[in-house]
Structures are given as C-alpha cells and as structure tokens.
C-alpha cells in the first residue's frame, strides 16, 4: 500500500503493482500535475475503500489517538491497508503510528521512520484530565480538541503518559 509520498518520490518502476486509494489521485494532482501524468502510465491498482474498512481505520486511529490529525486521504489509505493486511509505505508518522498499533508492517521512504508507537489523548488545559479520542472525532491538522467534560476548558492533543 503506497502513501502519496511514495507516488511523488519513488521511481516509476518501484511503484509497479502498488495499491493506492482513489482519493490519492486528487491529492497527487494538487501537489504535482506533471507527476500525476507520469503516474497514469505506471501499473498501479487504484481502489476505493469500503465503508466497513473506513470504520476499521477510524477505530484504529481513535485507538492510537491519531484520528483527529489524519486526513480523509490518510484514512482511505489506512482502510485499504488494514482491509487487506497490506504493508504500508509512508513517511507520515501519524499513519505509521496508527498502522503499527493496528498490527500492520510499515516501511518508511526517506526518513528513518517512527521508532516507537505512541498513544495520544486530549488533555484538558485546566484540570489536566485526559480524554480518549472518539472514533467520530473530526479531522483537523491543528487546534484544540473538545471542551473538557469536567471543567469546560479546551483540550489539547498530548502523548499519553505512562
């Protein structure tokens, strides 16, 4: 299973036979129209994840705590990888973390890859209570999480202690 980073940077012969999510086409077109034209000539399998596999990916993202920082394209890629038990090629640390926590084999491209698997939680800035990430958490690259159910203060994503 190839992440968009592999599509952008790997030689075409290394991409042959790789599995990709249909949603990656739009991402690739936005990032590099010229590369997208080259990719069209590569022997890739383009698939759309099922709702059931997307639900599995969301639950895996919630279990690791990474869900709010995963994009819809990230979730599509994870869903296809989880659905088929495919190895995942990505430099995205959040995707690596979620995939490893879900039991998938992950390969980094240009980085050394994540050395540890972490769990993330929403921690209240007021009372410091930790809240698990819900499987229906909205995706946002930055910003606070839901308000604390104890004191009403905003929460921030933090690595789970202990």
Positions of the model-derived regions?
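Feature 3881 marks metal-assisted phosphotransfer/nuclease machinery
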Residues: 1-84, 94-162
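Conserved SAM-binding loop
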Residues: 88-89
């Amino acid at each position: 299973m190839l992440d968009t980073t592999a599509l952008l940077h790997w030689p075409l012969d290394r991409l042959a036979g790789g599995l990709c999510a249909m949603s990656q086409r739009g991402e690739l077109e936005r990032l590099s129209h010229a590369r997208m034209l080259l990719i069209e000539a590569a022997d890739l399998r383009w698939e759309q994840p099922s709702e059931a596999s997307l639900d599995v990916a969301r639950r895996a993202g919630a279990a690791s705590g990474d869900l709010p920082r995963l994009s819809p394209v990230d979730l599509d890629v994870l869903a296809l990888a989880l659905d088929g038990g495919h190895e995942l090629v990505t430099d995205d640390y959040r995707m690596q973390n979620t995939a490893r926590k879900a039991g998938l084999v992950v390969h980094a491209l240009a980085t050394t890859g994540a050395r540890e698997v972490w769990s993330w939680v929403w921690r209240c800035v007021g009372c410091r209570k930790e809240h698990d990430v819900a499987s229906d958490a909205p995706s946002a690259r930055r910003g606070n999480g839901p308000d604390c159910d104890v004191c009403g203060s905003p929460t921030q994503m933090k690595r789970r202690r202990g």
